[in-house]
Curated annotation (Swiss-Prot):
Compartmental location: Nucleus, Nucleolus
Residue stretches spanning the membrane: none
Name of the protein in question: 60S ribosome subunit biogenesis protein NIP7 homolog
Secretion signal, residue range per the UniProt entry: none
Source organism of the structure: Sus scrofa
CDD domains cross-referenced by the UniProt entry: Nip7_N_euk, PUA_Nip7-like
Name of a matching Pfam family: pre-PUA_NIP7
Protein family according to the UniProt entry: Belongs to the NIP7 family.
Protein backbone atom coordinates (compact mmCIF):
# COMPACT_ATOMS: atom_id res chain seq x y z
CA UNK A 1 0.00 0.00 0.00
CA UNK A 2 1.62 3.21 -1.15
CA UNK A 3 0.62 6.79 -1.97
CA UNK A 4 -0.15 7.54 -5.61
CA UNK A 5 2.54 9.11 -7.77
CA UNK A 6 1.90 12.54 -9.24
CA UNK A 7 1.02 11.05 -12.65
CA UNK A 8 -1.34 8.47 -11.13
CA UNK A 9 -3.03 11.16 -9.04
CA UNK A 10 -3.49 13.38 -12.09
CA UNK A 11 -5.02 10.57 -14.18
CA UNK A 12 -7.35 9.50 -11.37
CA UNK A 13 -8.47 13.03 -10.47
CA UNK A 14 -9.18 13.83 -14.14
CA UNK A 15 -11.46 10.80 -14.32
CA UNK A 16 -13.26 11.60 -11.06
CA UNK A 17 -13.58 15.28 -12.05
CA UNK A 18 -15.59 14.20 -15.12
CA UNK A 19 -18.34 13.17 -12.70
CA UNK A 20 -18.12 15.58 -9.77
CA UNK A 21 -16.16 18.56 -11.14
CA UNK A 22 -14.68 20.91 -8.55
CA UNK A 23 -16.42 18.98 -5.75
CA UNK A 24 -13.34 16.74 -5.81
CA UNK A 25 -11.91 18.75 -2.91
CA UNK A 26 -14.89 17.69 -0.77
CA UNK A 27 -13.83 14.04 -1.05
CA UNK A 28 -10.45 14.66 0.55
CA UNK A 29 -11.31 17.33 3.15
CA UNK A 30 -14.37 15.91 4.85
CA UNK A 31 -15.86 17.20 8.11
CA UNK A 32 -15.57 13.73 9.70
CA UNK A 33 -11.81 13.51 9.12
CA UNK A 34 -9.13 13.56 6.45
CA UNK A 35 -9.31 10.94 3.73
CA UNK A 36 -6.67 9.92 1.22
CA UNK A 37 -6.15 7.65 -1.77
CA UNK A 38 -3.74 4.71 -1.63
CA UNK A 39 -2.60 2.26 -4.33
CA UNK A 40 -2.45 -1.48 -3.67
CA UNK A 41 -2.18 -4.11 -6.46
CA UNK A 42 -3.12 -1.54 -9.17
CA UNK A 43 -6.33 -0.67 -7.27
CA UNK A 44 -6.95 2.73 -5.70
CA UNK A 45 -8.51 2.75 -2.24
CA UNK A 46 -10.22 5.67 -0.51
CA UNK A 47 -9.47 5.43 3.20
CA UNK A 48 -9.48 7.64 6.29
CA UNK A 49 -6.07 8.51 7.67
CA UNK A 50 -7.11 7.10 11.05
CA UNK A 51 -7.69 3.62 9.57
CA UNK A 52 -4.57 3.97 7.44
CA UNK A 53 -2.44 4.40 10.57
CA UNK A 54 -3.99 1.28 12.10
CA UNK A 55 -3.26 -0.73 8.95
CA UNK A 56 0.42 0.25 8.97
CA UNK A 57 1.09 -2.79 11.19
CA UNK A 58 -0.08 -5.24 8.49
CA UNK A 59 2.40 -6.37 5.85
CA UNK A 60 1.54 -5.53 2.23
CA UNK A 61 1.40 -9.13 1.01
CA UNK A 62 -1.15 -10.08 3.68
CA UNK A 63 -3.36 -7.01 3.13
CA UNK A 64 -6.36 -7.77 0.88
CA UNK A 65 -8.02 -4.35 0.78
CA UNK A 66 -8.42 -1.25 2.89
CA UNK A 67 -11.20 1.30 2.77
CA UNK A 68 -13.32 1.60 -0.38
CA UNK A 69 -12.01 0.61 -3.79
CA UNK A 70 -12.48 3.60 -6.12
CA UNK A 71 -11.13 1.94 -9.23
CA UNK A 72 -8.06 0.44 -10.80
CA UNK A 73 -5.29 1.29 -13.20
CA UNK A 74 -5.24 -0.76 -16.38
CA UNK A 75 -2.05 -2.08 -17.96
CA UNK A 76 -2.06 0.97 -20.28
CA UNK A 77 -2.12 3.26 -17.19
CA UNK A 78 -5.70 4.41 -17.68
CA UNK A 79 -7.99 4.65 -14.66
CA UNK A 80 -11.30 2.77 -14.53
CA UNK A 81 -13.83 3.66 -11.85
CA UNK A 82 -15.45 0.78 -9.98
CA UNK A 83 -19.08 0.70 -8.91
CA UNK A 84 -17.93 0.73 -5.28
CA UNK A 85 -17.15 4.46 -5.75
CA UNK A 86 -20.80 5.26 -6.55
CA UNK A 87 -21.78 6.04 -2.94
CA UNK A 88 -19.07 8.70 -2.79
CA UNK A 89 -19.60 10.18 -6.27
CA UNK A 90 -23.41 10.37 -6.29
CA UNK A 91 -23.87 13.11 -3.63
CA UNK A 92 -21.41 15.41 -5.42
CA UNK A 93 -22.44 14.68 -9.03
CA UNK A 94 -22.84 17.76 -11.23
CA UNK A 95 -24.63 16.02 -14.08
CA UNK A 96 -27.36 13.47 -13.47
CA UNK A 97 -29.65 11.30 -15.55
CA UNK A 98 -32.89 9.77 -14.27
CA UNK A 99 -34.20 6.70 -16.06
CA UNK A 100 -37.73 5.34 -16.21
CA UNK A 101 -38.64 2.20 -14.23
CA UNK A 102 -38.92 0.17 -17.44
CA UNK A 103 -35.33 0.98 -18.40
CA UNK A 104 -33.81 0.32 -14.97
CA UNK A 105 -33.49 -3.43 -15.44
CA UNK A 106 -31.86 -3.03 -18.84
CA UNK A 107 -29.31 -0.60 -17.38
CA UNK A 108 -28.64 -2.91 -14.41
CA UNK A 109 -27.85 -5.73 -16.84
CA UNK A 110 -25.08 -3.60 -18.36
CA UNK A 111 -26.87 -2.04 -21.35
CA UNK A 112 -26.73 1.58 -22.49
CA UNK A 113 -29.63 3.97 -21.76
CA UNK A 114 -31.89 4.65 -24.74
CA UNK A 115 -33.90 7.84 -25.30
CA UNK A 116 -37.11 5.87 -24.68
CA UNK A 117 -35.88 5.04 -21.15
CA UNK A 118 -34.72 8.56 -20.29
CA UNK A 119 -36.80 10.24 -17.58
CA UNK A 120 -34.88 13.48 -16.96
CA UNK A 121 -31.43 14.86 -17.60
CA UNK A 122 -29.59 17.74 -15.96
CA UNK A 123 -29.66 20.95 -18.01
CA UNK A 124 -26.49 21.90 -19.91
CA UNK A 125 -25.07 18.38 -19.95
CA UNK A 126 -22.55 18.29 -22.77
CA UNK A 127 -21.76 15.34 -25.00
CA UNK A 128 -19.30 12.82 -23.48
CA UNK A 129 -19.78 14.32 -20.02
CA UNK A 130 -19.64 11.90 -17.07
CA UNK A 131 -23.10 11.42 -15.52
CA UNK A 132 -24.50 9.57 -12.52
CA UNK A 133 -27.57 7.50 -13.40
CA UNK A 134 -30.50 7.55 -10.96
CA UNK A 135 -33.85 5.80 -10.82
CA UNK A 136 -36.91 8.06 -10.81
CA UNK A 137 -36.99 7.52 -7.02
CA UNK A 138 -33.54 9.22 -6.74
CA UNK A 139 -31.65 5.99 -6.03
CA UNK A 140 -28.17 5.98 -7.61
CA UNK A 141 -27.93 3.05 -10.05
CA UNK A 142 -24.55 3.63 -11.65
CA UNK A 143 -22.63 5.98 -13.86
CA UNK A 144 -21.94 6.49 -17.51
CA UNK A 145 -21.02 8.98 -20.20
CA UNK A 146 -23.59 11.16 -21.97
CA UNK A 147 -23.75 10.10 -25.62
CA UNK A 148 -25.76 13.21 -26.51
CA UNK A 149 -26.00 16.69 -25.05
CA UNK A 150 -29.18 17.83 -23.30
CA UNK A 151 -30.31 19.73 -26.41
CA UNK A 152 -29.64 16.76 -28.71
CA UNK A 153 -31.63 14.44 -26.42
CA UNK A 154 -34.80 16.44 -27.05
CA UNK A 155 -34.83 15.83 -30.79
CA UNK A 156 -33.23 12.39 -31.11
CA UNK A 157 -34.85 9.10 -32.20
CA UNK A 158 -36.43 7.09 -29.28
CA UNK A 159 -34.13 4.11 -29.97
CA UNK A 160 -30.93 6.20 -29.94
CA UNK A 161 -28.41 5.76 -27.14
CA UNK A 162 -28.27 8.79 -24.81
CA UNK A 163 -25.98 7.40 -22.06
CA UNK A 164 -23.11 4.97 -22.54
CA UNK A 165 -22.97 2.44 -19.69
CA UNK A 166 -19.83 2.54 -17.51
CA UNK A 167 -20.81 0.78 -14.27
CA UNK A 168 -23.99 -0.17 -12.41
CA UNK A 169 -25.02 -1.71 -9.09
CA UNK A 170 -25.83 -4.98 -10.87
CA UNK A 171 -22.06 -5.55 -11.00
CA UNK A 172 -22.17 -6.48 -7.32
CA UNK A 173 -23.96 -9.67 -8.42
CA UNK A 174 -22.35 -10.17 -11.84
CA UNK A 175 -18.75 -9.70 -10.70
CA UNK A 176 -18.90 -10.51 -6.99
CA UNK A 177 -15.80 -12.72 -7.12
CA UNK A 178 -13.56 -9.98 -8.57
CA UNK A 179 -14.80 -6.88 -6.70
CA UNK A 180 -12.63 -5.91 -3.74
Amino acid sequence: MRPLTEEETRVMFEKIAKYIGENLQLLVDRPDGTYCFRLHNDRVYYVSEKILKLAANISGDKLMSLGTCFGKFTKTHKFRLHITALDYLAPYAKYKVWIKPGAEQSFLYGNHVLKSGLGRITENTSQYQGVVVYSMADIPLGFGVAAKSTQDCRKVDPMAIVVFHQADIGEYVRHEETLT
